[in-house]
Every structure is written in structure tokens, then in C-alpha cells.
């Protein structure tokens, strides 16, 4: 995943800001504590990665500073999301590329004044894919295609697939715009965070079984 694509996925969880551990409303008003929200990592187990045929390509954190207002006061809030990225190669036009991608995002909830300010928990998958499009203009022509139930964090969750067109392959190829299948899970509240997963691959391959194996293997480390 390139830097831009990482920022896209990291940005999914930061539109409304994440969860503070141990910060009271009085702390916020007086400004007596630095406001820092950091999600715990979420990862796919080694056995699930091996079963899927994917490999772990990187784990990363993404920190964003936003101004946050409450009780008539405004302060800067530092939000840290955790990303885990997995991929596997495909062969196109006789050349091998990283063609299938699976990303796990853990983003803080931002619980303050008995409210959760991170909107991800209230978004459905249509809203999540719209947010992805806003942050990643190489994906377009998105159409909702199907829904299914898949295991994620120990329970059956809704996963929606979308048909899209995007610049997923290197532009040096004769065809750089390809039809894509995008899998998006609902956001799941776990601990003080929300966890959601995104899988992307060309439509010419069916990676649904592999995506479901990865989903079932996700563990939150909080």
C-alpha cells in the first residue's frame, strides 16, 4: 500500500476523533492534561494469515492532530490510529504485482462527556465507502453489490462488497484502470476502540474465502 492509500485508510477513523483513557470533562475544560487518544493495535493471527495465502506487509500508526470543542472550550487533540496491512501477489500480463490487499484499522472511540465523538461507530458501510472515495480519488464508479455474514472478533458481522473501478495496478501496465471488488466490514466496538476491515482485489480473482479467513483471524490487542 502506498503512502496515499495508507493515509486514506487511516483517515477513515479520524473524521470525528477518538477515545481518551482517563480524561475527565474537568480536565478538558481546565486544560490540565494533554489530550491524547491512541488505539490499541488489531492484528490478524499468524495461522489465519498463513491459511489465507497473504503475508503481513506492514504495521503502522497514524497520528493526526485536530481541534476539538466541548463545553464552550476548544483544544487540540492528538489521535493515533493503528493499521495492519496484508497482501499477496497476482500475475497480470505475465508480471507479478501486489494485487490483493487487506487492511485492519483500529481507531479510538473518543468517549467524553458520556458521548462517543468518533462517528465511525454509527456509520454503515455505504457511508464508509463514501468516505474512502473522498480520501482516495483513484477509486470511482462504486456500486453496492452484495452482503454476507462473516466472523469478526468472535461474532458474525455484516460485510458488504462493492464493485468499483480504480488505479490498483502500476501505471506502466497497458491497462492501469481495473475493475475492483472492495469488501468492507461494519465497525465493531471493542475495548475503547472501533475496529473495521477493508479488502481490495481485482474482480478477475475471487478472494472472498481468503478475506473471510483474515476477518475471522482478527484480534484486538487491548
Question: Model-predicted segments: where are they?
Answer:
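Acidic, polar-rich N-terminal leader regions of halophilic archaeal proteins
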Residues: 2-222
